[in-house]
Amino acid sequence: RLAVGVALVFVLASLLGAGAQPVVSTKQDIAVFSLGYYGWFIPFQALGTIDLKIQEVFSDIGRFRVFGTAQRLSSHGLQQFIDALRRTKQGNVVVPEQYQFGEAFLTKAEFERLTGAFIVVVPVVTNFAVYWDAKAATWHCSITTGFTFIDVAHDATVIAVESIDTSGSDKTSMNSAVMYAINAIPPQLEYKIRSIPQFQISTRILEAQGPTVKIQLGANMGLKKGDEYAIVEKRTFGIIEDTREAGLIVITDVSQQVSTGRVLYASAGLNADTQLKEIARQGVDFDLYFHSSGGQMLPGFRMTASRGFYPLRPFVGIQIPLGNAIVTTVVDIVPVNAIFGAEYMIPIGRFHIAPYAGVGLTYVHIAVPPIGYESDSLTHLGAQAGGRIGYLVSRDIRLYVDVGADYWLPLDRIHFREYGGLTIGAGISFKL
């Protein structure tokens, strides 16, 4: 009896331990149809480019084993395909030698190959327009692409339907306008994929030493510097298991199978096997701020690249020197400073310090409504440097103060004056 009791204890301990093990994502099999476009005229070269870029996104994102098909489904054919998948999953269906889904045909072998994937993705164009804007003397192109994600492994359930709107314009070439619209698809598609819960990376801490942690998975699953992972805490209430976010980690370095992270905050101590969950972001911090420099008021915004960059992060910014702006019924003078630079991010828990520097140009639009006169010109060259101290008030928002210096040199000293000096300011940052 003692031996049986000890054995039962070990079995129960084993089962409980197995239930507490963290989840670690592995690559999923995914099949991607070619782009369906029935009802829309799309240049053949553009069609091939869209197909290639869509395939590249699913391949480069790192978390899938991808195989594609040359077949294209229309919106009507998509529903027929889903219905056929469901009938096949339910069994007792005579499998034909050839399927027809709208305008597309699949052989029995092609259909079975697709149903062998865990997920099937069907992209379909729902809008494609190219037109010449005579007033602006510009070609414009707009594309709306729908993506339907079908979980073939579980009764052909549609797990997500995403729509991506892109546009492009060019003054000299229609083809260039189309390509600009096409090139805008991949970054939006990647973000959409990473936002779908079934595709988000789950992983665990391998080792914790103070604020530095080693994390299972790396470039082999598409992790990048600047990615953020939530620390997940599991609680059990009776027979209900609940989870909540209990902290935040930013990825600071990535190797092939292991990544290094920095703990920004955590509500409890961390150890090996702590569960982590990917937070999908577009990879940009959007800052709104108000600066004062040498008596000049400078409201503005800044966009800093966060995904793929750490600790050096490039940024672009726009600010308006209010002291040089004139808006009346007679004349409008609107100056805008465009700034390009980089910051060096140093996190210290919820706080961070970020020295930064940048250079810029001032663009001025002058309009005289009574006589219909308008002109645009570059008026200043500028530079700025300083430091930022920020505090992470929540997972997605920072508050910060800036101290530094600005200097703006006029290109035309007859009509414009230099300005700048000690800069102080404050703002709010949204992690998008």
What residue ranges belong to the model's regions?
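N-terminal segment of the mature soluble domain
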Residues: 33, 40-121, 159, 234
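Amphipathic beta-strand/beta-sheet edge segments enriched in Tyr/Trp
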Residues: 116-169, 258
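Short secondary-structure boundary motifs at beta->alpha junctions and helix caps
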Residues: 150-184, 238-257, 375-378, 404, ...
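Beta-strand/loop-dominated core regions that host nucleotide or nucleotide-derived cofactor-binding catalytic loops
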Residues: 167-171, 186, 190, 198-203, ...
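Short glycine/proline- and aromatic-enriched beta-strand/turn motifs that initiate or cap beta-hairpins
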Residues: 281-310, 431
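Gram-negative (and chloroplast) outer-membrane scaffold detector with strong preference
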Residues: 302-388, 393-397, 429-431
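Outer-membrane beta-barrel "beta-signal"
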Residues: 419-432
